[in-house]
Regions:
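Short, glycine/charged-enriched secondary-structure capping and boundary segments
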Residues: 22-23, 71-74, 110-112
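General structural signal for secondary-structure boundaries
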Residues: 39-44, 76-85, 158
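Short, T/G/N/S-enriched strand-turn elements that build extracellular solenoid repeat scaffolds
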Residues: 45-50, 68-69, 84-87, 107-108
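A domain-level signal for caspase-like cysteine endopeptidase catalytic cores
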Residues: 1-58, 96-98
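A short, glycine/acidic-enriched catalytic loop
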Residues: 64-91
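Active-site-proximal C-terminal subdomain of hydrolase catalytic domains
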Residues: 95-158
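Short acidic, S/G/P-rich loop/turn micro-motifs used as interaction or catalytic elements
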Residues: 12-18, 42-44, 62-71, 101-105, ...
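Short, well-ordered alpha-helix to beta-strand connector turns
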Residues: 53-54, 92-93, 111
Length: 158
């Protein structure tokens, strides 16, 4: 039996901590080991090597169509996941991409597979940019529900 190895890349940022339930209960199944969780403090080269060593990569945080922002947690680069990581991420059908406009990143890189988000509203200012009237309380409730549902069903048989 092959054990699935999961890498989680979630740059340390209080405004995206609501996503922690997506991965906090991973592992413990006979066919899954506890994930490797990276929140910052490592080089892009090490991230690339870790991606290659794992069967599935879960990437979460702030981002754009160009990739996942490093939010100052991974040295000088503004991105931790971008086009330079696509080759390492390819051929991993169970990857998860959760950041604003991850769908646009996926469209630009057709070799990538997995579950991904579109625009993700995490604060009132983002909602206002899209003419959505919502309180921070409603946004938090929606985001917490999303993270808990994904976390509860992430390892179910496909």
């Amino acid at each position: 039996i092959k054990v699935m190895k999961t890498l989680v890349i979630h740059p340390q940022d209080k405004s995206t901590d609501f996503l922690i339930p997506v991965y906090m209960n991973l592992g413990g199944f006979p066919d899954f080991e506890k994930p490797t969780i990276i929140r910052g403090g490592v080089s892009r080269d090490l991230i690339r090597e870790l991606i290659k060593q794992h069967d599935r990569v879960i990437m979460l945080g702030h981002g754009s169509p160009s990739g996942l922002f490093s939010v100052g947690q991974f040295g000088q680069s503004g991105m931790i996941i971008d086009a330079s990581m696509v080759e390492a991420l390819s051929n991993k059908p169970n990857n998860i991409y959760i950041w604003c406009n991850a769908d646009k990143f996926m469209e630009q890189h057709p070799t990538l597979q997995g579950f991904y988000s579109g625009m993700f509203i995490s604060e009132v200012g983002e909602a206002a940019m899209y003419n959505i009237k919502a309180s921070q309380e409603v946004i938090n409730e929606s985001n917490n529900l999303f993270a808990n549902v994904v976390g509860n069903y992430i390892d179910l048989d496909q």
